[in-house]
């Protein structure tokens, strides 16, 4: 948040609606289904679709844990992951489409699409590099960034 000139303010999910309504915070990151389901559109006026997060969330397991599993256990986890992925992608796409249609239909709410993401990526590049080095996960971060190019 600081990279974009803001100050991050931790707010519990259950308190976010009121925090937005009273001006304790002036923005929040959420996806269209969440904005619709908890009625954030009542207390905010704009949703920017900058695709800064991957929804449904990705699943990551440590190599150390996976190496302790039997081949059959690993196969079961990967199979369950593939099945869950197929289901969730379909369910998420349908919910997101319906939520966006709803939000776009509101007269006092604006959905901004087709955002130029390059400036966002440039702003967070140094932070991402610094934190990856600090945590010793440069290769993992590179892998995730390369993987996300396929979506």
Where are the regions a protein language model picked out?
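N-terminal secretory/targeting leader peptides
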Residues: 1-151
């Amino acid at each position: 948040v600081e990279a974009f000139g803001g100050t991050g303010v931790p707010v519990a999910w259950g308190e976010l609606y009121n925090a937005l309504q009273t001006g304790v915070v002036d923005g929040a990151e959420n996806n269209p289904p969440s904005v619709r389901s908890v009625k954030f559109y009542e207390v905010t006026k704009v949703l920017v679709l900058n695709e800064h997060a991957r929804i449904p969330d990705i699943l990551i397991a440590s190599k150390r844990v996976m190496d302790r599993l039997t081949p059959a256990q690993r196969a079961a986890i990967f199979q369950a992951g593939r099945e869950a992925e197929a289901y969730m992608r379909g369910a998420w796409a349908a919910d997101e489409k319906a939520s966006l249609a709803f939000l776009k239909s509101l007269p006092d709410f604006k959905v901004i699409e087709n955002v130029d993401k390059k400036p966002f990526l440039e702003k967070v590049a140094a932070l991402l590099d610094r934190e990856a080095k600090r945590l010793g996960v440069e290769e993992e971060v590179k892998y995730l960034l390369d993987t996300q190019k396929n979506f």
